[in-house]
Amino acid sequence: CKNNPVNRIDPDGMDDYRYDDKTGQFHLMKQTDDKTDRVLGYHLNKKTGEYKQNTKWHQTKTRMEGIEKGILSDEVNFKENDNVISVGGEGKPTVTGVENFVIELSEMVGLEIGGFEYSKKGVTEVSNVYIGRYQSSKDNPSRWNTDQRAYPSFNPRIAGSMPNEVDFHVDFHTHLSKFPESDRLRPSGLYTPGGDMEYKRGQQSNG
């Protein structure tokens, strides 16, 4: 549903999408036989009013690729809406797959993106990833601790659960690759003003 902020996944995935830089919407352009989704570059043909895939050498042909199925859907909007993505199990993306998407999306739009990984109370494995909208995010690392949009509030209406009904495993936000390493590798902890996903992953690898 267009106005539903909860991501309704396409169980088949394997599609090509166009990203609208102005509105923040992803538009399904073509269904393919690929195992993963991708976001391709398009331009508006002023004569026909239709979007055409970029093919010339000076045009961006691929904006994002290797996106696990179940993350993107037609008209989903991460810019203006918070979204919840169900992870794990058949036909669903993995936590790592969603993290990869968030990092690449953050780089593509040039803004920080934050969210939570959580499960039902008492469940040890993450079952959902809550991605906060990035409409008001900043790309200035000196303001990382004042940028509220990089630390989204948990919205029960969108999540379908009250905060006391879930266990929060991770809260995260991204730091753009252009940031200095001192900013990108701040520790990430629950409800603390720090933490890039890159640091979180490094700790997991060393743990």
Where would I find each of the regions flagged by the language model?
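A structural/positional concept
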Residues: 97-98, 116
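Short consensus segments that form the blades of beta-propeller domains
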Residues: 103-109
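Short, solvent-exposed aromatic-acidic interface loops
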Residues: 128-139
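Acidic glycine-/aspartate-rich tracts in secreted/extracellular proteins
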Residues: 4-6, 33-34, 122-123, 175-179
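A short, charged
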Residues: 50-84, 155-186
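Short beta-strand scaffold segments in enzyme catalytic cores
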Residues: 112-121
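Short turn/helix-capping motifs enriched in Asx and small/polar residues
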Residues: 1-74
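Active-site-proximal loop/helix of nucleotide/amide-processing enzymes and allied scaffolds
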Residues: 11, 16-26, 146-207
